[in-house]
């Protein structure tokens, strides 16, 4: 059948195993007010840049997220260390599906992050991803042609 861009898929939130450290790919979604099940977009995603956070900022963020998600939520030491050293967007943890991460090309991600944006935080000039490869859990790339000619 025909698929539409607004179709969604069930959330697959696996925090703290997967969290919003710098470089992860996560599924966009509509807000909780219209999407209480936190269903993920099938076609829209984002790549996290965020910022490094100190312990005080992480504590404050953890408390805000706990008020939203419940007392079960906390940042394990390993997650805290990643946010202190690499950075990310911890306020999104536990509420969005994380499904991958950048394995090379962080300098490209940084250049995209520095692109001038408009009042809606959208790039003034389109930024297009021209080539991407799927890499399995074993670290090997799926070398099938994805419709793009090199």
Language-model-detected regions and their locations in the chain:
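Cyclophilin-like peptidyl-prolyl cis-trans isomerases
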Residues: 1-150
């Amino acid at each position: 059948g025909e698929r539409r861009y607004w179709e969604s898929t069930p959330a697959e939130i696996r925090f703290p195993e997967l969290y919003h450290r710098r470089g992860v790919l996560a599924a966009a979604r509509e807000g909780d007010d219209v999407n209480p099940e936190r269903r993920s977009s099938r076609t829209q995603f984002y790549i996290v840049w965020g910022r490094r956070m100190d312990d005080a900022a992480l504590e404050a963020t953890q408390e805000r997220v706990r008020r939203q998600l419940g007392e079960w939520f906390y940042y394990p030491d390993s997650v805290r260390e990643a946010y202190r050293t690499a950075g990310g967007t911890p306020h999104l943890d536990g509420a969005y599906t994380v499904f991958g991460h950048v394995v090379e090309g962080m300098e490209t991600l940084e250049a995209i992050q520095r692109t001038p944006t408009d009042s809606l935080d959208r790039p003034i000039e389109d930024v297009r991803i021209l080539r991407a490869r799927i890499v399995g859990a074993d670290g090997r790339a799926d070398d099938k042609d994805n419709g793009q000619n090199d």
